[in-house]
């Protein structure tokens, strides 16, 4: 099977390990066929959250992927086709799944949803951050051989839709920069303070790879996060509080996707 997946692969941007796909084949990480996935995908990190969104918010749901238990579903939300698929944790995982969705499944828009840790007094527990841009300690951009430092940013149309919907539904949302880190258990005690001094709102682990993939492939991306932990004072949400806060973010992401789709982008 691996040999057949390699035959005929001629993409200019060949993956590091040589995997590829033919025009009528799934990727090594996704069993979906062409047309199974909507133009807009909501991407939580947790596969069970992807299932929860599909079960709770979408109609006429069809599962298109369960490879490595990374669940993917397509359904209908308020008359608009929307897919939801998990990304896993970290930039390498997000990098793989978002790249394949953009490149091989003709997805145009990805909205990343997840949790983040606040490092700013501008956002506290339960608040939602809309990431206009993302700094990173990752070397993900090294593959592009750029002569400088790239600044990954969100698509303004998606960002504007999300911000307007947050005001409409009375959801507390702050627009600003986040930082994507490769390290969850950071040994540097000054890490968060240094980024906070630059006005960064929160720390997370995926958005830089998503934004860079979108830029490289001329697609659209937005990341939004619920603040589940305040890294400045040590406070955090309970399991029940996290679910309630995440529901607000899920609704915001779905309404953003719907408005963006019916409006043809902004």
Question: Model-derived features: where do they sit?
Answer:
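Glycine-rich beta-alpha junction loops
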Residues: 47, 117, 179-184, 209, ...
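Active-site rim beta-loop-alpha module in soluble metabolic enzymes
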Residues: 152-198
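N-terminal amphipathic/basic-hydrophobic helices that include classical n-h-c signal peptides
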Residues: 1-24
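Zn-dependent metallopeptidase/amidohydrolase metal-coordination segment
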Residues: 208-242
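Generic non-transmembrane alpha-helical segments
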Residues: 161-169, 213, 252-260
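Metabolite-binding pocket within alpha/beta catalytic cores that recognizes anionic/polar moieties
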Residues: 19-160
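Flexible, glycine/charged-enriched surface loops at secondary-structure junctions
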Residues: 59-66, 170-176, 261-266
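His/Asp/Glu-rich mid-to-C-terminal helical/loop segments that flank catalytic regions of hydrolases
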Residues: 231-266
């Amino acid at each position: 099977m691996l040999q057949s997946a390699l035959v005929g692969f001629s993409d200019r941007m060949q993956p590091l390990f040589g995997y590829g796909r033919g025009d009528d084949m799934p990727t090594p990480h996704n069993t979906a066929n062409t047309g199974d996935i909507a133009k807009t995908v909501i991407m939580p990190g947790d596969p069970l959250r992807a299932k929860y969104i599909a079960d709770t918010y979408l109609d006429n749901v069809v599962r298109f992927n369960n490879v490595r238990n990374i669940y993917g579903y397509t359904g209908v939300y308020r008359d608009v086709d929307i897919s939801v698929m998990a990304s896993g944790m970290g930039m390498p995982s997000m990098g793989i799944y978002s790249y394949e969705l953009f490149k091989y499944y003709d997805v145009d828009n990805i909205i990343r949803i997840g949790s983040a840790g606040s490092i700013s007094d501008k956002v506290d527990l339960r608040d939602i951050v809309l990431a206009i841009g993302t700094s990173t300690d990752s070397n993900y951009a090294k593959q592009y051989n750029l002569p400088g430092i790239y600044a990954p940013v969100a698509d303004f149309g998606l960002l504007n839709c999300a911000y307007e919907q947050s005001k409409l539904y009375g959801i507390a949302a702050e627009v600003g920069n986040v930082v994507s880190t490769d390290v969850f258990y950071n040994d540097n005690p000054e890490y968060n303070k240094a980024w906070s001094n630059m006005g960064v709102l929160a720390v997370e682990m995926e958005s830089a790879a998503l934004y860079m993939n979108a830029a490289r492939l001329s697609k659209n991306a937005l990341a939004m996060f619920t603040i589940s932990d305040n890294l400045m004072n040590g406070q955090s949400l309970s399991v029940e509080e996290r679910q309630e806060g995440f529901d607000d973010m899920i609704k915001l992401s779905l309404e953003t996707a719907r408005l963006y789709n019916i409006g043809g982008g902004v």
